[in-house]
Design a protein with these regions (language model features):
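GNAT-family acyltransferases
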Residues: 1-115, 132-133, 137, 145, ...
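Catalytic cores of transferase enzymes with a strong primary signal for eukaryotic protein kinases
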Residues: 55-57, 146-150, 154-157
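Conserved acetyl-CoA-binding loop-helix of GNAT-fold acetyltransferases
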Residues: 119-136, 151-159
């Protein structure tokens, strides 16, 4: 089991903001690693999760390759990839993931929670923790691209303070929010 870190974001000058573990009220957000592949593939095995995003449930082997690629980080030095699996502390279940593609001022967010754990507020809780972490590390704008018929993701975006814009990309609406600037510590 993991030691209990303090709630909220923590980084040091030598730690990338996209590779630190995070903690919310009920979840440990752990940087993605290939060893999460089997649990993550099982958690996300419901084909209904792909209704709005396309694709199919990944096999454990496909998920291992994906986790390794994501853990390696972006090949573009102008952006960082942050990918965290969500571990429910109450029972240890790996329930999904959140991710952020972080550029100089903007982070694009995504969240997926497996069907058995939906409607419990876990995606909102995890994404809110991620947003607080990104704001604390200097990100000023958060965006998410959401299919117009994906009402559950739109509700999460609203709960996070994101608002739909008139812009679309690949048929998805761009949602956006300005994040608060970090408060300087003295």
């Amino acid at each position: 089991m993991h030691p209990d870190p303090a709630p909220g974001p923590t980084t040091s000058p030598t730690t990338s903001p996209t590779t630190v573990p995070l903690r919310s009220e009920r979840l440990d957000l752990l940087p993605i690693a290939p060893e999460h592949a089997g649990e993550l593939a099982a958690a996300l095995a419901d084909p209904a999760l792909h209704t709005f995003t396309g694709g199919h449930p990944a096999t454990p082997e496909e998920m291992r390759a994906r986790c390794a690629r994501l853990a390696a980080g972006s090949p573009d030095p102008a952006e960082q990839w942050g990918n965290w699996v969500l571990r429910l502390r109450a029972d240890g279940a790996l329930t999904g993931y959140v991710q952020a593609t972080v550029g100089p001022d903007e982070a694009e967010l995504a969240w997926v929670v497996g069907t058995p754990w939906q409607r419990r507020g876990l995606a909102t809780e995890a994404a809110r923790t991620l947003l607080a972490h990104l704001a604390a590390t200097g990100t000023t704008t958060a965006v998410a691209h959401i299919h117009p018929d994906h009402h559950a993701s739109a509700a999460i975006a609203r709960a996070l303070g994101l608002h739909p814009t008139p812009h679309t990309h690949d048929g998805e609406t761009r949602w956006q929010a300005t994040l608060p600037r970090p408060t300087p510590t003295t």
